Amino acid sequence: MDLNKFTEKAKSLIQSAQMKALGAGHQIFMPEHLLKVMLEDESGLVQDLINACGGNVQSISDAVDSAIKKLPVIEGPGSGGLQLSREIAKVFEDSIGIAKRNKDSFVAVERLLQGLTAQKDDTVGKILAENGVTPQKLNSVVAEMRKGSSADSPNSEEKLNAAKKYTKDVTELAMQGKLDPVIGRDEEIRRTMQVSLRRTKNNPVLIGEPGVGKTAIVEGLANRIVANDVPLGLHDAKVLALDLGALIAGTKFRGEFEERLKAVINELSRAEGKVILFIDELHTLVGAGATSGAMDASNLLKPALARGEVRCIGATTLDEYRQHIEKDPALARRFQPVFISQPTETDTISILRGLKERYEVHHGIRITDGAIIAAATLSNRYITDRFLPDKAIDLIDEAASRVRIEMDSKPEVIDELERKVIQLKIEAEALKKESDENSKQRLKKINEEIENLNSKFADLNSKWQMEKNKIARIQETAEKLDNARKELELVQRSGNLGRAGELMYGVIPQLENELKNQEKVTDSFLKKEVTGDDIANIVSKWTGIPVDNMMHSEKEKLLNMENEIGRRVIGQKDAIEAISNAVRRSRSGVQDTNKPFGSFLFLGPTGVGKTELAKALAEFLFDDQSALLRFDMSEYMEKHSVSKLIGAPPGYVGYEQGGRLTEAVRRRPYQVILFDEIEKANPDIFNLLLQILDEGRLTDSHGKLIDFRNTILILTSNLGAEIMLKGNVDSVRNEVMQIVKSAFRPEFLNRLDEIIIFHSLTRDDIYKIIDVQFSYLQKTLAKRKLSISLLQEAKELIAQTGYDPEYGARPLKRVIQECIQNNLAKLVLSGEVVENDELIVYALDNEILVKKV
């Protein structure tokens, strides 16, 4: 027998059957072994053929098992060989004959099954015939399955039912009610149908940003086809989604992929327009399956698409369409673009209302209308790098998931009681070892308290369990109601009016009333609904922008913001007030939403607190002064340094990395940005800042829009510092502003919220700054368990030595470092100072000294 005449699948089954025979200890290879292996085959081809003939796979399998058990078993030496029986040889001979008569080049699996049914006098033939699989029935089923095609390659089985193997039936899913409802999008669905009903090039391609609902439009079309709400040309049409992964998976040799795809195309061509092929991520076809010299999937599809033999709907993003499809004009002209725009906030709210019930059933909670409106508005305002409705749906889903987790977790009051009981039990165990009267009295009191708490815990716990059970029942009823509604749609389509009436007027109203009554029960423990606050909380988690409702403590903190920051930044009341007002405007929601929270130009001599105020603001907002995004503009003096901020242009090194400014803001949209010594920056950088200050956005080198509306921009400059030192701020303001106007363009200055001139520091300010700096030193030493205090005469000497109006507060830091920290370091290293020592800073003979108390 020449195995080369058989397909790869048939060969594999024959070899598996031989192994089965050897494994069972049989020396003769019988048809029973072959049929058993064919029935166990994972591809399911033989099972499908038997079912199509009206046979029962399980009863055939049981009968074959009984027949195999009756075969003689050989043990001992010489039992390892295997011979072909006369019966199996006849099966192969008949199979080859059937294949030749049907003009097949190779013997496929179905021909082997036909060969088995042809053995009318053998055990296998009788088993099959008794179960309804006769040669006549099988021949007609195989002919129907083959649809005139022949086995002309070693992998011909893969061509059979290729559409079923490599596609997913979207209309079938719609019929089963497994697709989410599609709300709106009527114009886009109508346009898709319009293109699909053309005579040639009837292939719409849905082009839109990720998440705008391209796939949903195809699902909406499938729902309409099922509901018969389509033009006559689309009645009884099927929408099949191509599974490119399944098409490519397992293609070991060149040509296998092309063979599979060609089989799908041929099968769709034979459907004569009754099947629409949906290709999600259409751009993946370009280059798919192509090896050196081989054609890719798109080239195989082109002829069928041009002639209108295959009706296709593609979906891809704008970028991918431009990058892959437009590069191939021959492919592009076969598709008709249908542009899918992002829905508006109002449309998104309608979409969410339509989907609400599905998410309520899945999570077993209620979603309020306030949550739906918040999801649409907050996602549109704060999540700028994604698109509606996808981002709004994700917000609803995650907020519902969070509420569900909270429901399943132990309530805080019960958890606290449980911990308290454990704590008291530990204390009671310790007291049992004591014999004095006080301990006995305390033990008695603890036992009473434990008993009391246990009783309280039992009551609350049973109440919680009851509430959980009620919620489980509500979810169960909601699921039953959802399934009843799906069933109603199915029976209405199938014309079973009796069952439809039963569902519509009996089951569904009963379940609705039941659900209403169950939801009436008020609960004290568990939160069962998603509100706008939950959505705001998720937005805050995603973006880091505090959009959730402020706690009372935060409101107090914001109202006293000047005092908080004033403890750290001394002598700059105007600047602190301007910054505080900007933060309050943004958090209270009265800020213009199309520009940054605040943009300020800080002017003043060196060392007066310009950079320190930016750090203090970052610490106030984020409890972390490193949350400040700082750019030293002395690094951006060259013309080409603009690319450091927004990213290198295409073709240059570093293009993939993005810009320092744009990437930082994209990842963390809520932060303080400091441009230090802005006058040193290249003039081109001001052109970038104009866009940020005016519109609150900037486009990076990749073409992505970066949102700066949730940032505070602070620019510092030393311009006019020498004039400020001559007199007070009010008297020199005009002179300083003239210098500023000559350095910066009017359109730049005009876009700033405020230009703040910092005061020179007075001697009183210096004393306060010494206190602030000394408190930092005290905190550092406290970590080493050392305490230090500063005497008044030492403070006055530090102020006298470190005060220089021209240099501001920076000399103070140097004096503290040289006179106090250097002496401290020597004392610590010499061992004179150890843990828990008290130190004092004093002045003697115009010298600042440190000693142990």
From Swiss-Prot:
SUPFAM superfamilies: Double Clp-N motif, P-loop containing nucleoside triphosphate hydrolases. Residues 393-524 form a coiled coil. It comes from the Bacteria. Its main location: cytoplasm. GO terms for cellular component: cytoplasm. One of its GO terms (molecular function) is ATP hydrolysis activity. The keyword Acetylation does not apply. Residues 554-760 are annotated as: NBD2. Pfam families: AAA (PF00004), AAA_2 (PF07724), AAA_lid_9 (PF17871), Clp_N (PF02861), ClpB_D2-small (PF10431). GO terms for biological process: cellular response to heat; protein refolding. ATP 1 binds at G208, E209, P210, G211, V212, G213, K214, T215. Residues 761-853 are annotated as: C-terminal. Residues 84-148 are annotated as: Repeat 2. The keyword Ribonucleoprotein does not apply. Residues 6-71 are annotated as: Repeat 1. Residues 3-148 form the Clp R domain. Keywords: ATP-binding, Chaperone, Coiled coil, Cytoplasm, Nucleotide-binding, Repeat, Stress response. Residues 161-342 are annotated as: NBD1. It is found in: Cytoplasm. ATP 2 binds at G604, P605, T606, G607, V608, G609, K610, T611. Residues 343-544 are annotated as: Linker. Part of a stress-induced multi-chaperone system, it is involved in the recovery of the cell from heat-induced damage, in cooperation with DnaK, DnaJ and GrpE. Acts before DnaK, in the processing of protein aggregates. Protein binding stimulates the ATPase activity; ATP hydrolysis unfolds the denatured protein aggregates, which probably helps expose new hydrophobic binding sites on the surface of ClpB-bound aggregates, contributing to the solubilization and refolding of denatured protein aggregates by DnaK. Belongs to the ClpA/ClpB family. The Clp repeat (R) domain probably functions as a substrate-discriminating domain, recruiting aggregated proteins to the ClpB hexamer and/or stabilizing bound proteins. The NBD2 domain is responsible for oligomerization, whereas the NBD1 domain stabilizes the hexamer probably in an ATP-dependent manner. The movement of the coiled-coil domain is essential for ClpB ability to rescue proteins from an aggregated state, probably by pulling apart large aggregated proteins, which are bound between the coiled-coils motifs of adjacent ClpB subunits in the functional hexamer. Homohexamer. The oligomerization is ATP-dependent. This is Chaperone protein ClpB. It comes from Wolbachia pipientis wMel.
